């Protein structure tokens, strides 16, 4: 039997077991640990499913006679390297009815060995060539201020397919807080998001001791609550909100009291009383008890996240934050009290500790804080920049040797499965697994985490790197991220979900509101804790000196070492 050199095989079919792939221009490498596209055991070599002139997927060769009614998939992505929280494997990925049907070997079982029964390519099967590319789940941005609709294409162009947050546009409340309050506002925003190819979960206002006011929002379509200090995050409000959350099953996102007016971090923890809660921007630059809100990442019931402007700590981080904070929280730099408020939130020691806590898996998620001290199009990029900086500073994670699979699995989970689990969306989205919505992002390795080749929303191409539309082929410059047919309002609604509290469906909201986008109830998250966040479960002891702001993690002081240079930056972007 003739053999191919490994390099020749990779050129023809993409990398296979033992091959390593560099992620963009970072120091991070992933290694393929299994090749499902070769069939069970990786032994069915020589007839890999490849599309093109003179290639495999042709009638009575790699294409079988199976009709859609007989189970043929609508789409197969061939030979992609899947990077997910559960591993790094090569596979053909089948999609049917907008959901992932299987990972395995695709083709024609009449002529090929080891074909997965749910990956039989028929005349009705479309093909995307994933060979040599990396496939991830669509990103979940768990901290979105809905300030302007233009955020949606910016997010989609970077692989974000789910938006969790709140707002009504550029109102002062929205510019500061991720809240869509009142049934009328919720219904207007749900209608506004109906034609965009993104999943949406809107958060209602939890800053009240009126349980009736909170239940009213849940029945109107809120998928959870936001507690924000600008509305008054008092211990009484925290307790009342969590009581309603426990009764309804939804998540609560917390932005605590920076000024410590109603209590200190210990008082907030006492009000939480061991109940599950999602702590936004846990480091504190985005808000929260100064200077020690970061200590909440020690607790098993706290689901901690970061927002991306502090990711990772660089020589420019502190300077840009002061101006951002003044605008976002409606402060006046000429008022001494406002300036003191702003400066109390920007601490190099806690930002440096945030880097380490992400690498340990102690801070579990990363979101944007879009246009409110964060950038909606940089969730994915900032995550991998953090991973790169941590590898340079801390070396390989336990279990990693020539490749960084453990670190890659930890970091990809921070913007996919972990936020999905935290908000009760993981039955539908968050990973590349059979049965889930086919929200998928395909990258050339050199552009990983920076510019996707394709973004699939519910199995249909919604966004892509596309050349001049008047050219004779798709590739002539300028190649830009552009909306595709899946971004049109009809397929966008059909391929996306509107997440709501169970109480909304029980109250018949889906029938009353009449959205094109299907409404799906969030799962009960009240018994979920950090232990349920894949690859990000650590609960180290974290202490902050109240005078010097020095942070100690398991007794070891963190020294600030801001990065002066990052990958995935000017090499890819002009501006």
Curated annotation (Swiss-Prot):
The gene is ureC. Ni(2+) 2 binds at residues 226, 255, 281. Its EC number is 3.5.1.5. It is an enzyme of class 3 (hydrolase). Heterotrimer of UreA (gamma), UreB (beta) and UreC (alpha) subunits. Three heterotrimers associate to form the active enzyme. It comes from Parafrankia sp. (strain EAN1pec). This is Urease subunit alpha. It is found in: Cytoplasm. Carboxylation allows a single lysine to coordinate two nickel ions. The lineage of its organism: Bacteria, Bacillati, Actinomycetota, Actinomycetes, Frankiales. Disulfide bonds: none annotated. Gene3D superfamilies: Metal-dependent hydrolases, Urease, subunit C, domain 1. GO terms for molecular function: nickel cation binding; urease activity. PROSITE patterns: UREASE_1, UREASE_2, UREASE_3. One of its GO terms (biological process) is urea catabolic process. The modification N6-carboxylysine is found at residue 226. One of its GO terms (cellular component) is cytoplasm. It comes from the Bacteria. Binds 2 nickel ions per subunit.
